[in-house]
Amino acid sequence: MTYTLAILGCGVMGQALLSAIYNAPKAADETAAAFYPSKIITCNHDEPSAQQVTDLVETFDESPNGIKVESTYGHNVSAVEEASVVLLGTKPFLAEEVLNGVKSVIGGKLLISLAAGWTIDQLSQYTSTVCRVMTNTPAKYGYGCAVVSYSADVSKEQKPLVNELISQVGKYVELPEKNMDAATALVGSGPAFVLLMLESLMESGLKLGIPLQESKECAMKVLEGTVKMVEKSGAHPSVLKHQVCTPGGTTIAGLCVMEEKGVKSGIINGVEEAARVASQLGQKKK
């Protein structure tokens, strides 16, 4: 089996998926190889955007799975006509215009949508086989997370294909669609929240006299090592947090100040607000 994948809107997230799929390790056997497209057509709205994709692909080595890439602009209809699988990578406010432009040719195609807030019901107006995906920018480096929901019409043969493609970004998690707005906040916006924590740790070191580069390196390693500790130990973060604290010590003193400043509630409320906004993104599209 060979097929073409069309990416409608190959910006930050589209390029992250393109990079992950194109550079995926060579498939172990013919069954796995069939999940990868022989060709990817990227579709953008203007020549500079298309050239950006071309420049990106030129930095890659040859695809381990023999995937070829064609970067285009203004040719959405012909790209979708050729494709069996369509990945919608446009910003949510552009999705309606883009989908209406290919409405006559997208029926019967498998649609993988990255458009936050667009529900399966809304997307099913264009094709019945729909997969909603929320991933994040670390996907570009293979360290992302992707939450996936399927329409009822997606077949048992199509799900493994989506699983294989999306797993290249990092962690693949299948959840009911009712969780997608929360996933948009936690997974999609999550890197920005973590980067705020990283920035805060860096700047605290700088304020206390540690040079910026060394402060950055230490803060990055603290985050990386802590995540690994949670992963390897299997313990709840609160248990590990209290293991660091000693009576009258530095850690509990710092934690008490952070609690007074509302750090934990601020993070929780921030994620909740991001989820609320995500729930509104598709409300105007009936």
Curated annotation (Swiss-Prot):
Q: Please give the GO cellular component terms listed in this UniProt entry.
A: cytoplasm; cytosol
The record, for Gene3D superfamilies, names: NAD(P)-binding Rossmann-like Domain (3.40.50.720), ProC C-terminal domain-like (1.10.3730.10)
**Modified residues annotated as Phosphoserine in this record:** S279
NADP is among the record's keywords: yes
For molecular function, the Gene Ontology terms on record are: identical protein binding; pyrroline-5-carboxylate reductase activity
**Xref: SUPFAM superfamilies:** 6-phosphogluconate dehydrogenase C-terminal domain-like, NAD(P)-binding Rossmann-fold domains
Tell me where the cross-link Glycyl lysine isopeptide (Lys-Gly) (interchain with G-Cter in ubiquitin) is found: K171
Coiled coil stretches, renumbered: none
Where does the record place the modification Phosphothreonine? T246
Pathways involved: Amino-acid biosynthesis; L-proline biosynthesis; L-proline from L-glutamate 5-semialdehyde: step 1/1
> Might you name a Gene Ontology BP term for this protein?
proline biosynthetic process
Pfam families to which the protein is assigned, alphabetical: F420_oxidored, P5CR_dimer
Q: Give the E.C. number(s).
A: 1.5.1.2
Catalytic reactions of this protein: L-proline + NADP(+) = (S)-1-pyrroline-5-carboxylate + NADPH + 2 H(+); L-proline + NAD(+) = (S)-1-pyrroline-5-carboxylate + NADH + 2 H(+)
Keywords of the record = Amino-acid biosynthesis, Isopeptide bond, NADP, Oxidoreductase, Phosphoprotein, Proline biosynthesis, Ubl conjugation
PANTHER family reported for this sequence: PYRROLINE-5-CARBOXYLATE REDUCTASE (PTHR11645), PYRROLINE-5-CARBOXYLATE REDUCTASE 3 (PTHR11645:SF0)
What the record says about family reads: Belongs to the pyrroline-5-carboxylate reductase family.
Tell me more from the record. Present with 43500 molecules/cell in log phase SD medium.
Q: What does this protein do?
A: Catalyzes the reduction of 1-pyrroline-5-carboxylate (PCA) to L-proline, the final step in proline biosynthesis.
Q: Which NCBIfam families match?
A: proC (TIGR00112)
User: What quaternary structure, including any partners, is listed in this protein's UniProt entry?
Assistant: Homotetramer.
Q: What is this protein called?
A: Pyrroline-5-carboxylate reductase
The gene coding this protein: PRO3
